A protein has these predicted regions:
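Conduit-forming functional cores of very large proteins
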Residues: 1-218
Length: 218
């Protein structure tokens, strides 16, 4: 199955100090946080109130990096309006010679079933699912473009694309996009006990404070 959306922490870790309750919620099997080195101090004024300063080097090494998944879906259907039959089906729009193709969009990454190929690098101008509508009465039997377009600003890679059949016998196409996201200023974080704060500044590693042993906070 493919969920509508999902966020996965890439490098989740179990807490160093545990309670007996953890054995009942399977926290060690599904870690939801990371163990970081924290310095409680004032540094530069960008961590007033609930702000947090982050080490740029730690972020580049993968700290709090997440993978965001979102899904696009389309269904074939057949309808009749005032005696006119209209069928909507999956198709490679360019090969079918459909009318109404949207200018500026890239249809070249669709396979023979009309789904974008897996591992294709995404942007908001690449068609996700190719669909065409055919009505003998209105368009003389010629296919009209009804493709599914990505949302504005869509980036990432095509993680999964597959087709199945619904209860009514019509096909269902689903495409999952994965996008790697990095912490940025304004993102919200919290401790394991729920104390929240936002990222106020990302500091280069060479400018971070350090202990006499050379340990720098994350």
């Amino acid at each position: 199955r493919i969920d509508k959306m999902g966020v996965v922490l890439n490098y989740g870790q179990v807490p160093l100090i545990k309670s007996r309750y953890l054995q009942y919620i399977n926290n060690e099997e599904h870690p939801y946080g990371e163990n970081v080195i924290v310095a409680i101090m004032v540094y530069g004024g960008y961590n007033v109130e609930d702000s947090i300063l982050f080490n740029e080097g730690s972020l580049k090494r993968g700290m709090f990096r997440t993978t965001y998944y979102n899904m696009y879906e389309a269904r074939e259907e057949s309808s009749s309006v005032r005696g006119a039959q209209r069928d909507t089906r999956f198709a490679n729009i360019q090969k079918e010679g459909a009318i109404g193709i949207k200018p500026g969009y890239d249809y070249s990454h669709l396979d023979e079933h009309g789904l974008i190929r897996e591992n294709t690098e995404m942007d908001d101008k690449k068609v996700v699912i190719g669909m065409g509508s055919v009505s003998i009465h209105n368009d003389g039997g010629q296919m009209r473009d009804m493709s599914v377009m990505p949302k504005k600003g869509q980036l990432g890679f095509v993680d999964k694309a597959f087709m199945t059949e619904g209860e009514t016998g019509f096909r269902i196409g689903k495409v999952r996009i994965r996008e790697e996201r990095f912490p940025s200023i304004g993102d919200k974080f919290c401790s394991r006990c729920g104390q929240k704060g936002t990222c106020g500044l990302i500091i280069p590693e060479k400018d971070m404070p350090f202990t006499k042993d050379g340990i720098r906070p994350d």
